[in-house]
């Protein structure tokens, strides 16, 4: 069966499904016949996702896990595998922003962002890959950013983590191609997502980078006015899963495509 012939039993796991790109992607895939498992850090906070799914007559299963914790990821994916039997597609969406100039960003700050945006995705990959290799099929979609290709002003931790995830994704694609596993990198620009509301802290310890920080805030404002609906990213993700002519990279959204 070609990837474009989606079985109703195809199981897709979307991390960070509670909001933004993750929520839109989970709903979009469910609408197109996938058995969707959305991961959230707290099921108690998944009300909007579940309410929208109910309104649209869709079913989305939830799994509680925190990608920052190896133990949480192991337990969460064991739970999904117990319920679903297998995982066909992993969409690594969960992540955080991270602002700061190189001079003013501590090693701890870099590591904190890397632990989520890079290591969190890697933990999830390691949880699903043995089964995919054994079945010789599957897709891993890593959501990076336009900031994974082009440096952004005053976003050193975020840029570092996303560039690293791009490199790991390229490496992974080479490693797993022989097992019939596909890897795709989706690179959103500015998209309608809660990450911007959460990512407003602008360290300026020396006072030297105030203008750079201001430019970043201006870019956020322009992005908020022109942001691409998150479902458009979900559509690209589904295309990356289903296409018979796959690419490694898929830029999308305002400022990205």
Region spans (language model):
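Active-site helix of classical SDR
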Residues: 125, 161
């Amino acid at each position: 069966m070609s990837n474009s012939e989606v079985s109703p039993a195809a199981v897709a796991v979307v991390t960070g499904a509670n909001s933004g790109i993750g929520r839109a992607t989970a709903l979009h895939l469910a609408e197109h016949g996938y058995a969707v498992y959305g991961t959230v850090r707290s099921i108690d906070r998944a009300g909007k996702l579940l309410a929208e799914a109910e309104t649209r007559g869709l079913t989305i299963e939830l799994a509680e896990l925190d990608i920052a914790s190896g133990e949480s990821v192991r337990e969460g994916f064991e739970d999904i595998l117990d319920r679903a039997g297998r995982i066909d597609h992993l969409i690594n969406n969960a992540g955080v922003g991270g602002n700061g100039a190189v001079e003013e960003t501590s090693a701890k700050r870099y590591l904190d962002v890397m632990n989520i945006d890079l290591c969190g995705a890697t933990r999830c990959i390691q949880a699903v890959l043995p089964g995919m290799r054994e079945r010789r099929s599957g897709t891993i979609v890593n959501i990076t950013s336009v900031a994974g290709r082009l440096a952004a002003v005053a976003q050193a931790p975020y840029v570092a983590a996303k560039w690293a995830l791009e490199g790991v994704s390229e490496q992974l694609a080479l490693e797993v191609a022989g097992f019939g596993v596909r890897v795709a990198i989706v690179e959103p620009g500015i998209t309608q997502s809660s990450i911007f509301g959460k990512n407003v802290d602008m360290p300026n310890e020396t006072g030297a980078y105030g203008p750079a920080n201001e430019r970043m805030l201006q870019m956020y404002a322009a992005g908020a006015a022109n942001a691409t609906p998150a479902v458009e990213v979900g559509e690209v993700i589904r295309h990356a899963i289903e296409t018979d002519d796959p690419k490694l990279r898929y830029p999308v959204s305002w400022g990205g495509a």
